[in-house]
C-alpha cells in the first residue's frame, strides 16, 4: 500500500493545454471512474482523502453497493465511486484504509492501488464458466423431464441450487454491507420461493436469465468505459529523455518540467511540451477532435497524447507528472460525475423508494387475495415473486448516468469539455448565447495597424513604452503590441509594479514614471478625438498610451473574424438560439463585427456591466456566455452556463462550465445539439425502464406473464437502456 501524498491547491479544470500542477483537495471529488489507487491525503475540514481502483463492477448499481459498504464505517465523512473510471474516493478523519479494503471485499468486490497496473483479464472460458455450467445443466434437466418427470424435477432443483449458491452468497454479503434491496437479494428470494411452490423449471430459468443479463450488462459497461480507457491509453508508458547529450529510456512519471525529450515520427507525447525543433505537424485529434494535423513552430505548446506525424521532434517538458492535458481531461471526467444533473439526482432518489414500494406491493399481492378472498396461495405467491423481480431498479438507475456519460464522452471526442450532467442539462435548455468579441468571435490575434504619437515622441518610442507595460499580459491586444515591438527589434525596458485595471487597461512603472495603457474613452484625449473616431469607424480598436496623465499617442489594432464564425451563427439560428455580442471594445469596432454576423451588440462594457447584461438576458430565457478573458469570468458565472474558448485565460477556463479546446465556434453548435440529444436519450431511457416495468406489472397481475419473462424484461430493459445511451457515442 502506498503512502498518501500531500496536496494543497486545485488545478484549473479546463486548462487542457497549459502546464499546471494537478492537486487533489478533499473538497474536489473525482467521480468518474479512472481511479488512482494510492490513497491521497488532503489537509482540510474533510480530513484525509484516499482513492483506489475497484474491480468487479458491472453497472452503476454495483457502484452504489460499494458506496453503501464503505459508508457504514466509522470515521468516513464522504464516499463516492466513479463508475466510468472505476475509482473509489473516501474522505475520512483518520487512516481507515484497511477497514475500507475489508468492507469492499466483504461486499464482493476488490480494491487495488491506483498506480498499479491493470489486472490481467481472466480467460473467456473461466469468466463464463458459471453461465456455461448452468446452460448445460438446464439442457440436461429439460431432457430428463421429457423422459422421467420426477427425475427432471430433481435435476431442475439441483440446477437451481447450483445457480443460486453464488447469487445468494453475494446477497448475504450485500445485506451485511447495507444494500438490503439489491437485485441479488430479489433473485434469491424469487428462486427460493419458486422452489417452494414447485415451479422448479422456472426457478432455474430465472437464474439462467439473470446470469445472461449480468454478462450483457458487463459487456455494455465495458463499451461505455472504452472512451475513458482509450484516453488513458494515449500516454506511452516510457519516454526518451536527453541528458548530457545521451538518450535514456525513462518512465513518464519520472519526467519533470525542463526535461528535454525526443518523440519519433508516429510516437505520442508523454507530457505537455514546448517544441524545440524548427517546426512539425502533430495529430491532436484524440484530444481536440481536430482531424487535420496541426502545424507547430518552435516555442509552441503541444499537449500530451498528440502524435508527431512525420518527423523526429525534440521538446521541453512543461507539465508535472499527473498534470498533463490527458490527466486534466480525466480529472474533469471524474469531477463531471460528481456534478450530477438534477434529473439524475431525482431518479436516484426515486429508485431508492421504488424497490421497497414494489416489495411492499408484492407482499400485499401474495397475502391479500388468499387471506381475504380465499384465492389460491400458490397462484398469488407466484405472482408476488414475479413482482419482486419487476422491482429491480437497475435499468432505471442507469437510465440517466449512462446517457450523460456517453454524452460527455462524445463531446470530449469533438474537443468540447463539459463539467458534468448539471452543465449538460443547462446547455440543452439554452436558447440564447452571449459572445465576447476579442478572442471569441475573432481569432484573438490582432495586429497593430497604425501608431500615432504626440508631438515630441517617435513611433518607436511610443511602441517601446507600450510594449514595456504590456509585456507578460495575456490579453490578445497586449500580446499584439509586444509582438509588434519584437518584430521591429526594439529594446523593451523592464516595467515594475505592473497592475491590471479590470475593464480599463493596465498600468506600470517604466523608468520611474507611471504609464497607463487604456481603451479610448477611458481617459481624455481631445487632441486625438477626430483620429480615434475615424479609426473606430473603420472597425479598429484604439488604445491610448498615457504617461503621468499626459497622452503620448494612440495605437490602432484590428482583429480578424474566425473563419467559421458566420457559419456557426447561422447554425445557431437554425437551432432557435439567438446571439448577442457583449464587449468592452468601442461601439464602432463592435458594430463592424456585429454587422458581418447579423448580431445585436452591447459595447463599451466593464465586467460589472457584462454581468448586468447577462443577468437581464438570463431572466427571459436560459443564456450561455462564451468568452476567453479575465473580464469575461464574472459574466460566465452569472449566465446559466459559461463556455470558455480553449485558448482563454486560466481564470476563464476555471470559471466556465464547458470549454471548446479547438477554438472552433461550430463546436458550440455541436455541443448544444449533443446536449439536446442527450436529454432526448434520457427521456427515452426512462420511458423504456418504467414502461417495461409497468407493462409486466399489469400482465403479471392478469396472469399473462411469469417469473422468467419478468427477469427477461428486467435484463432486456437494462441492455436496451445502455445500448440506447451508447448511440450518443456514434453521433456525428
Curated annotation (Swiss-Prot):
It is found in: Cell inner membrane. Keywords: ATP-binding, Cadmium, Cell inner membrane, Cell membrane, Ion transport, Lead, Magnesium, Membrane, Metal-binding, Nucleotide-binding, Phosphoprotein, Translocase, Transmembrane, Transmembrane helix, Transport, Zinc, Zinc transport. Its main location: membrane. Changing residue 714 to E: Strong decrease in ATPase activity. It comes from the Bacteria. Disulfide bonds: none annotated. PROSITE patterns: ATPASE_E1_E2, HMA_1, HMA_2. The chain crosses the membrane at residues 125-145, 147-167, 180-197, 203-222, 357-377, 384-404, 686-702, 708-729. The record marks 693 as: Important for metal transport. The active site is at residue 436. Zn(2+) 2 binds at residues 392, 394, 714. Residues 48-112 form the HMA domain. It catalyses: Pb(2+)(in) + ATP + H2O = Pb(2+)(out) + ADP + phosphate + H(+); Zn(2+)(in) + ATP + H2O = Zn(2+)(out) + ADP + phosphate + H(+); Cd(2+)(in) + ATP + H2O = Cd(2+)(out) + ADP + phosphate + H(+). GO terms for cellular component: plasma membrane. One of its GO terms (molecular function) is P-type cadmium transporter activity. InterPro entries: ATPase_P-typ_cyto_dom_N, ATPase_P-typ_P_site, ATPase_P-typ_TM_dom_sf, ATPase_P-typ_transduc_dom_A_sf, Cation_Transport_ATPase_IB, HAD-like_sf, HAD_sf, Heavy-metal-associated_CS. The keyword Metal-binding applies. Has two high-affinity metal-binding sites, one in the N-terminal region and another in the transmembrane region. Both sites are able to access and bind metal ion independently of each other. The N-terminal metal-binding site is not strictly necessary for activity and metal selectivity, but is needed for maximal activity and may be involved in regulation. The metal-binding site in the transmembrane region is essential for activity of the pump. Confers resistance to zinc, cadmium and lead. Couples the hydrolysis of ATP with the export of zinc, cadmium or lead. NCBIfam families: ATPase-IB2_Cd, ATPase-IB_hvy, ATPase_P-type, P_type_ZntA, PRK11033.1. PANTHER family: CADMIUM/ZINC-TRANSPORTING ATPASE HMA2-RELATED (PTHR48085), CADMIUM_ZINC-TRANSPORTING ATPASE HMA4-RELATED (PTHR48085:SF5). This is Zinc/cadmium/lead-transporting P-type ATPase. It comes from Shigella sonnei (strain Ss046). The lineage of its organism: Bacteria, Pseudomonadati, Pseudomonadota, Gammaproteobacteria, Enterobacterales.
Amino acid at each position: 500500500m502506498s503512502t498518501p501524498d500531500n496536496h494543497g491547491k486545485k488545478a484549473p479544470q479546463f486548462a487542457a493545454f497549459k502546464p499546471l500542477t494537478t492537486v487533489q483537495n478533499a473538497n474536489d471529488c473525482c467521480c468518474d471512474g479512472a481511479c488512482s489507487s494510492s490513497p491521497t491525503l488532503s489537509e482540510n475540514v474533510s480530513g484525509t482523502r484516499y482513492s483506489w481502483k475497484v474491480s468487479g463492477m458491472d453497472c452503476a448499481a454495483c457502484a452504489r453497493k460499494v458506496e453503501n459498504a464503505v459508508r457504514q464505517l466509522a470515521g468516513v465523512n464522504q464516499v463516492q465511486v466513479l463508475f466510468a473510471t472505476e475509482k473509489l474516493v473516501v474522505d475520512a478523519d483518520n487512516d481507515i484504509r484497511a477497514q475500507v479494503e475489508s468492507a469492499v471485499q466483504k461486499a464482493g468486490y476488490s480494491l487495488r492501488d491506483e498506480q498499479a497496473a491493470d489486472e490481467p483479464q481472466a480467460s473467456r472460458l473461466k469468466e463464463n464458466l458459471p453461465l456455461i455450467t448452468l446452460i448445460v445443466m438446464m439442457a440436461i434437466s429439460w431432457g430428463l423431464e421429457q423422459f422421467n418427470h420426477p427425475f427432471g424435477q430433481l435435476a431442475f432443483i439441483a440446477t437451481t441450487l447450483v445457480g443460486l449458491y453464488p447469487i445468494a452468497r453475494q446477497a448475504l454479503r450485500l445485506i451485511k454491507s447495507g444494500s438490503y434491496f439489491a437485485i441479488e437479494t430479489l433473485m434469491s428470494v424469487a428462486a427460493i420461493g419458486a422452489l417452494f411452490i414447485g415451479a422448479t423449471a422456472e426457478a432455474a430459468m430465472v437464474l439462467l436469465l439473470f446470469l445472461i443479463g449480468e454478462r450483457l450488462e458487463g459487456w455494455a459497461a465495458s463499451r461505455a468505459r472504452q472512451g475513458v480507457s482509450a484516453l488513458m491509453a494515449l500516454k506511452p508508458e516510457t519516454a526518451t529523455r536527453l541528458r548530457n547529450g545521451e538518450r535514456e529510456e525513462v518512465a513518464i512519471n519520472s519526467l519533470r518540467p525542463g526535461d528535454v525529450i525526443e518523440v519519433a515520427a508516429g510516437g505520442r507525447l508523454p507530457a505537455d511540451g514546448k517544441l524545440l525543433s524548427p517546426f512539425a505537424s502533430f495529430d491532436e485529434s484524440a484530444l481536440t477532435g481536430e482531424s487535420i494535423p496541426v502545424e507547430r513552430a518552435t516555442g509552441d505548446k503541444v499537449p500530451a497524447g498528440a502524435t508527431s506525424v512525420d518527423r523526429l521532434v525534440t521538446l521541453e517538458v512543461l507539465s508535472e507528472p499527473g498534470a498533463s492535458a490527458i490527466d486534466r481531461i480525466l480529472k474533469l471526467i471524474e469531477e463531471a460525475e460528481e456534478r450530477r444533473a438534477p434529473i439524475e439526482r431525482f431518479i436516484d432518489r426515486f429508485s431508492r423508494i421504488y424497490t421497497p414500494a414494489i416489495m411492499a406491493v408484492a407482499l400485499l399481492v401474495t397475502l391479500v387475495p388468499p387471506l381475504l378472498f380465499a384465492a389460491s396461495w400458490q397462484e398469488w405467491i407466484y405472482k408476488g415473486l414475479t413482482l419482486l423481480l419487476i422491482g429491480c431498479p437497475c435499468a432505471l438507475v442507469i437510465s440517466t448516468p449512462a446517457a450523460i456519460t456517453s454524452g460527455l464522452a462524445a463531446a470530449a471526442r469533438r474537443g468540447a469539455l463539459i463539467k458534468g450532467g448539471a452543465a449538460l442539462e443547462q446547455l440543452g435548455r439554452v436558447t440564447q448565447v452571449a459572445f465576447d468579441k476579442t478572442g471569441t468571435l475573432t481569432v484573438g490575434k490582432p495586429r497593430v495597424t497604425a501608431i500615432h504619437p504626440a508631438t515630441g515622441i517617435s513611433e518607436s518610442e511610443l511602441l517601446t513604452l507600450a510594449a514595456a507595460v504590456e509585456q507578460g499580459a495575456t490579453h490578445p491586444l497586449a500580446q499584439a503590441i509586444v509582438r509588434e515591438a519584437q518584430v521591429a527589434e526594439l529594446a523593451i525596458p523592464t516595467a515594475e509594479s505592473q497592475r491590471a485595471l479590470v475593464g480599463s487597461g493596465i498600468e506600470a512603472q517604466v523608468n520611474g514614471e507611471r504609464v497607463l495603457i487604456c481603451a479610448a474613452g477611458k481617459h481624455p484625449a481631445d487632441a486625438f478625438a477626430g483620429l480615434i473616431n475615424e479609426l473606430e469607424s473603420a472597425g479598429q480598436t484604439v488604445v491610448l498610451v498615457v504617461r503621468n496623465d499626459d497622452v503620448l499617442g494612440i495605437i490602432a489594432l484590428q482583429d480578424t473574424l474566425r473563419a467559421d464564425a458566420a457559419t456557426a451563427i447561422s447554425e445557431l439560428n437554425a437551432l432557435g438560439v439567438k446571439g448577442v455580442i457583449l464587449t468592452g471594445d468601442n461601439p464602432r469596432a463592435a458594430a463592424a463585427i456585429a454587422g458581418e454576423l447579423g448580431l445585436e451588440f452591447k459595447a463599451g462594457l466593464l465586467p460589472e456591466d457584462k454581468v448586468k447584461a447577462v443577468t437581464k438576458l438570463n431572466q427571459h430565457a436560459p443564456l450561455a456566455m462564451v468568452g476567453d478573458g479575465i473580464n469575461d469570468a464574472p459574466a460566465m458565472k452569472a449566465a446559466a452556463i459559461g463556455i470558455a474558448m480553449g485558448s482563454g485565460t486560466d481564470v476563464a477556463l476555471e470559471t466556465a462550465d464547458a470549454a471548446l479546446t479547438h477554438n472552433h465556434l461550430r463546436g458550440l453548435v455541436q455541443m448544444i445539439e449533443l446536449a439536446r440529444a442527450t436529454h432526448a436519450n434520457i427521456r427515452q431511457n426512462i420511458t423504456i425502464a418504467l414502461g417495461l416495468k409497468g407493462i409486466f406489472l399489469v400482465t403479471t397481475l392478469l396472469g399473462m406473464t411469469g417469473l422468467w419473462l419478468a427477469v427477461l424484461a428486467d435484463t432486456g430493459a437494462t441492455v436496451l437502456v445502455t445500448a440506447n445511451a451508447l448511440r450518443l457515442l456514434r453521433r456525428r
